[in-house]
Regions:
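Conserved N-terminal/central alpha/beta ligand/cofactor-binding core
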Residues: 4-113
């Protein structure tokens, strides 16, 4: 079993990410959708990304984020128990799920359990 505590080099791009992870749940903005997530991501990526892969990511992001949350990641929650979301980057709607300012660390610790 991999132990987080035994890891000597804990710096990585994922570890240092503070903003959050995007998924179009529509918990705060009911108009949000995987289609809008696709558009925001594809356009903000200067249309460099493979549209088919960006579409898959936008469609599957909610189920992946829910799965990580169910494994014990410490995402912020609304009073109704749903994931809280905030604006981040150039996205049209609040879709960034976060764990304070330590989202990357929270996700990595969860995945390494």
């Amino acid at each position: 079993m991999y132990s987080w505590e035994k890891t000597k080099n804990r710096f990585s791009y994922s570890f240092s990410r503070r903003g959050g992870i995007n998924a179009a749940f529509g918990n705060l903005d009911k108009e949000d959708s995987w289609q809008q997530h696709f558009v925001d991501t594809y356009l903000e990526g200067y249309r460099i990304g493979d549209p088919n892969k960006v579409e898959i990511m936008a469609k599957e992001a909610p189920s992946i984020v829910e799965e990580i949350d169910n494994w014990g990641s410490n995402f912020a929650k609304l009073k109704n128990g749903k994931l809280d979301q905030r604006f981040f980057g150039a996205h049209k709607y609040r879709r960034t799920c976060y764990s304070g300012d330590f989202t990357g660390l929270s996700i990595l610790k969860t995945l390494l359990k």
